[in-house]
Structure formats: structure tokens, C-alpha cells
């Protein structure tokens, strides 16, 4: 059990916390103190009544502002994140001490040298890599990285060795060792060829006019080129599957298969055979069918604990067993996961494996809700109108001048999917050649409630405040549909309201005066 105690910087507060644990006979496993006013405690599980009583007593300590449970200590979180990152790297990476002895290595290193981690730690870098004097380089106290061509097991590598400096108790930077990364020259050449040949139009179907969506697309284009697992998060209807496919198409795997599985729509007993195959029936699973390509696991938060364990094993070494068979199969597949759920929350509740979360959370893409991207609403509307009209072979209707105001005022709880369905539904029943606000039927939705949801608490104070401010303006603008009326209602100047509406994309195009 781990607690995060929010507190003031007061002399003796930590001692009072420890005395409280001693008084209750609680065995403390660890304590970590954060300089920004947080103390982390790690101790054995308690009965509910004892735990509730302890929480109440901690809150009564002078200087304590709050206390809550957390799934991990800061050092544990950093260790798990580092381990997941190292495991995801396709290049061999070694960490060596001042004697050039290996103290950490990732799976790619173990595979290259044909040694398990515990045996690699018995070697020095010089015993593993010929042609470079590691000790002499470390003794020279280098300040910059050094690149060197090396040959290992007949393979050519570009070795990059980077010095690691840490601060001592006197705030002096002391050299403690180095990190060695080995880049295969063959792999680097293939990557350059793939970059030149990648599908530059992969993201062309994604509308990105708003700054937030532009940033997400730029981030996705970079992540698409990597082979590590990708986790895409976002509310329902934000386009997670569209981004997953675009990442595949923009990657070196574009010419290989892309398969998608919704973990929430398939019974638990069928998921294993769908993913890994069924030997008695001679059926290949998704991973085997997509060898060399990508697999999207949608709604990963719905996966059962048993399948989570099997997925974790597959992510670690790329091997699996078909149902009803002992033979191991190895494939090269990039796994992309998508979810609208808060995986950290599921980890805290014991519904999602902590180690799997860290394995998936190496590369993440968070898609913003449509209400946070008002500049994208009309371009999306124009796209859906044109697409539907062309599919039906009918003339494209004109968009009414006041349509922008109505659509950008709405909060869109269903995001892009809801907008698309609303436009399609309106066009199927449209009389005439103009799409007007009254043609689009939208369920009542209180936009003001958006700002107090859990997702609205993410980001900086300015971002949270902006979301709340936009929600208030969106809600009130319905009942006070002019800048002067709205300004009077809120007790601010007409100019201030006009600027705010323009900032959030809520202003009408025609003159409101």
C-alpha cells in the first residue's frame, strides 16, 4: 500500500508521520520525500477500518493538506518507465560503470551477445566490444559523446558512447559511467530508405486546422516511424482508429498487413484464438496474419487479466503459442492499442496490470475532444457534406451562414463521430439545396458540465481555466445570443466578450450589432 501525502514544508512533520506508523505497529517499507511538498509512504496492506482511521489521523497532522493512495512510489514509477523504455528500444543499449563493467542492458543487447542479463553483468564492455579502450576514455573524463565504428559477431555497428554525470553532496558533477548504444548500419540504411518511400498522404484524411490537432498530427507522424508499442487515448469518437491506421500507413510497415480487433466486442474465450490462433483448426491468429505489419487492439482497457498476461509476454519477446499447441511462434508485429478509459485508474483498482501499462505507455498519443478544437468543426462539416453528397450522387448543398455558430456552440459529447452522424442524418432528410441549423437535430447537452469532468482536470491551470471559460460562454451564448447581451449578463465589456468568443471560435460571422 502506498500513500501520497500533500503537505507544507514544516520541521518535524515527517517525524510525526513516522511516529504515527510506529504507534499503530505498521511496518514501513519505504519513504520518499519530494521537494515540492509531497511525502510518499510504502507499507503493508491494512484492513479497511484501520486504513480509514489512519487516513483520518494523517489528515489531522498540522501542515498536511491532503492524502491519497497511489499505485507506485516515485522511484518505482521511474524504474518501471525506464525498464519499459529500454525494452522497447530495438537497438542494443548498455550501461557501464567507471570500470566499464556492465550494470544494465536491454533485451536487444542480450540477444546480440547471446547472454542473459545476469551473465552480461559479469562482463566488461571491452570483453564484449573489441577495438575501443573504454577505460582510457572514461579516465579522460569526457564531456561529450563519442562515435565509433565497431564490428560485433560479423555485423557493423555505429557505437555511440555517452558519459553519465551525477551531482554529489557538494553539488559537483561527478562522472559515474557511460551509456553505450549500438546502431546497426544495415538497419539505419533500411530506415532511411523507408523514410523516403513512406506514404506522405497517410494523414491527409485527418482534418487538423486547430493548433491542438496540428500538434497531435505532427506528433503522430514522428511516432509512426518507430516500432515500439503505441498507446492512443481519447474520448469516444475522437478518431483513435483513424490515427492508428494512419500511423501504420506512414510507417515502414505500410506495405504489410494491418488488422484491428475490438477487445470489448469479442467474448473472452474467443480473444485468445483470435489473437494467437487455434492449432486444432489450423487457424492463424491476428499476430501471425499481420507478421511484418501492425495490429490495433481497440478498447484495450476491456481486456481480461488473463489475456493481459499473455499480451505482456508477447510484447516482451514477440513469441506466442497457438491455442492447443506447445510450439512457440515468433513474429514481427507493431502493436497499437487504443482506449477511452483511464488506464492509471484501472491500475489503481487492480483491473489492469501495472507492468503491462508501463510496457504500453512508452509512446502515447492523446487525442483532444472536438469541443477543444472548435476551428476543426466547420472543415469537418464541409468534408462530411461533400463525402455524403458524392457517395449519393447528389449536388453538394450550400452551408447556411449561421451554421458555424450553432455547431461550434454545441459541446459534442460524441466528438467527430457524432458530428459525422448528425450531418449524414440531416442530409438524408434535407429538402432544398441549403443545410441550415434547424436541419441538424442534436440532443440537449449541458456544455457547462464538461468543465468539471475528470478529463478537464488535465493540463496546466491556464488550460483548465480556458476549458471552463469556454464551457461557460458556450452555455450562456445560447440564451444571450449577442455579444452585448452576453456582456451585460456577465458584467464585462462588450469588447472583452467579443474577444473571448473569437478566441474560442464561438463568434458569429455576421454582424451581431
From Swiss-Prot:
Residues 2-72 form the ACT domain. Its main location: cytoplasm. Changing residue 2 to A/S: Shows a decrease in activation of expression of either mtr or tyrP. Does not affect repression of aroF. SUPFAM superfamilies: ACT-like, Homeodomain-like, P-loop containing nucleoside triphosphate hydrolases, PYP-like sensor domain (PAS domain). Changing residue 494 to A: Loss of affinity for the tyrP promoter. GO terms for biological process: catabolic process; negative regulation of DNA-templated transcription; positive regulation of DNA-templated transcription; regulation of DNA-templated transcription. Residues 482-502 bind DNA. Residues 78-114 form the PAS domain. Changing residue 176 to E: Loss of activation and repression functions. May affect the overall conformation of the protein. Induction: Interacts with its own promoter-operator region. Autogenously regulated by a mechanism that gives similar rates of expression of tyrR irrespective of concentration of the aromatic amino acids. SMART domains: AAA, PAS. The keyword Transit peptide does not apply. Changing residue 495 to A: Decreases binding affinity for the tyrP promoter. Contains an N-terminal domain (1-190), a central domain (206-433) and a C-terminal region (444-513). The N-terminal domain is required for transcription activation functions, dimerization and ATP-independent aromatic amino acid binding. The central domain is involved in ATP binding and hydrolysis, and is responsible for ATP-dependent tyrosine binding and hexamerization associated with tyrosine-mediated repression functions. The C-terminal region contains a classical helix-turn-helix motif responsible for binding to DNA targets known as TyrR boxes. Homodimer. In presence of tyrosine (or high concentrations of phenylalanine or tryptophan) and ATP, it self-associates to form an hexamer. At low tyrosine concentrations, homodimers can bind to certain recognition sequences referred to as 'strong TyrR boxes'. Homohexamers are the active repressing species, interacting with two or three tyrR boxes in the targeted regulatory DNA, including 'strong TyrR boxes' and lower-affinity sites called 'weak TyrR boxes'. This is HTH-type transcriptional regulatory protein TyrR. It comes from Escherichia coli (strain K12). The gene is tyrR.
Amino acid at each position: 500500500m502506498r500513500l501520497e501525502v500533500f503537505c507544507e514544508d514544516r520541521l518535524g512533520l515527517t517525524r510525526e508521520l513516522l511516529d504515527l506508523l510506529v504507534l499503530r505497529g505498521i511496518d514501513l517499507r519505504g519513504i520518499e520525500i519530494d521537494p515540492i511538498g509531497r511525502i510518499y509512504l510504502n507499507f503493508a496492506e491494512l484492513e479497511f477500518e484501520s486504513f480509514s482511521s489512519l487516513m483520518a489521523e494523517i489528515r489531522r497532522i498540522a501542515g498536511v493538506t491532503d492524502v491519497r493512495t497511489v499505485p507506485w512510489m516515485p522511484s518505482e514509477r521511474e524504474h518501471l518507465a525506464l525498464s519499459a523504455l529500454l525494452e522497447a528500444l530495438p537497438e542494443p543499449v548498455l550501461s557501464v560503470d567507471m570500470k566499464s563493467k556492465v550494470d544494465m542492458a536491454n533485451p536487444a543487447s542480450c540477444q546480440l551477445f547471446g547472454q542473459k542479463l545476469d551473465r552480461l553483468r559479469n562482463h566488461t564492455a571491452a570483453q564484449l566490444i573489441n577495438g575501443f579502450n573504454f577505460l582510457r576514455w572514461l579516465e579522460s573524463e569526457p564531456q561529450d559523446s563519442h562515435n565509433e565504428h565497431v564490428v560485433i559477431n560479423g555485423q557493423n555497428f555505429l557505437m555511440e558512447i555517452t558519459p553519465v554525470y551525477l551531482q554529489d553532496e557538494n553539488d559537483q558533477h561527478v562522472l559515474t559511467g557511460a551509456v553505450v548504444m549500438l546502431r546497426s548500419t544495415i538497419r539505419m540504411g533500411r530506415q532511411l530508405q523507408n523514410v523516403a518511400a513512406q506514404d506522405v498522404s497517410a494523414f491527409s484524411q485527418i482534418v487538423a486546422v486547430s493548433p491542438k490537432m496540428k500538434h497531435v498530427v505532427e506528433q503522430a507522424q514522428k511516432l509512426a516511424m518507430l516500432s515500439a508499442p503505441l498507446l492512443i487515448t481519447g474520448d469516444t469518437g475522437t478518431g483513435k482508429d483513424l490515427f492508428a491506421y494512419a500511423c501504420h500507413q506512414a510507417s515502414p510497415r505500410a506495405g504489410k498487413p494491418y488488422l484491428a480487433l475490438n477487445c470489448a466486442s469479442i467474448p473472452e474465450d474467443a480473444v485468445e484464438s483470435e489473437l494467437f490462433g487455434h492449432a486444432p483448426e489450423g487457424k492463424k491468429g491476428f499476430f501471425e496474419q499481420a507478421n511484418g505489419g501492425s495490429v490495433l487492439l481497440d478498447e484495450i482497457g476491456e481486456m481480461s487479466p488473463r489475456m493481459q498476461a499473455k499480451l505482456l509476454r508477447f510484447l516482451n519477446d514477440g513469441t506466442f503459442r497457438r491455442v492447443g499447441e506447445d510450439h512457440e511462434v515468433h513474429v514481427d508485429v507493431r502493436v497499437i492499442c487504443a482506449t477511452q478509459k483511464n488506464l492509471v485508474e484501472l491500475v489503481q483498482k487492480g483491473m489492469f496490470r501495472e507492468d503491462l501499462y508501463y510496457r504500453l505507455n512508452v509512446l502515447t498519443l492523446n487525442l483532444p475532444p472536438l469541443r477543444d478544437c472548435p476551428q476543426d468543426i466547420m472543415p469537418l462539416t464541409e468534408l462530411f457534406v461533400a463525402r455524403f453528397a458524392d457517395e449519393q450522387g447528389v449536388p453538394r448543398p450550400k452551408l447556411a451562414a449561421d451554421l458555424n455558430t450553432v455547431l461550434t456552440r454545441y459541446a459534442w459529447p460524441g466528438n467527430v463521430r457524432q458530428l459525422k452522424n448528425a450531418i449524414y442524418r440531416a442530409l438524408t432528410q434535407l429538402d432544398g439545396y441549403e443545410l441550415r441549423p434547424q436541419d441538424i437535430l442534436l440532443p440537449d447537452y449541458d456544455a457547462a458540465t464538461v468543465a468539471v469532468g475528470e478529463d478537464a482536470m488535465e493540463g496546466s491551470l491556464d488550460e483548465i481555466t480556458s476549458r471552463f471559460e469556454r464551457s461557460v460562454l458556450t452555455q450562456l451564448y445560447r440564451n444571450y445570443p449577442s455579444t452585448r447581451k452576453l456582456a451585460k449578463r456577465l458584467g464585462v465589456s462588450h469588447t472583452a466578450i467579443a474577444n473571448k468568443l473569437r478566441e474560442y471560435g464561438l463568434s458569429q460571422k455576421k454582424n451581431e450589432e
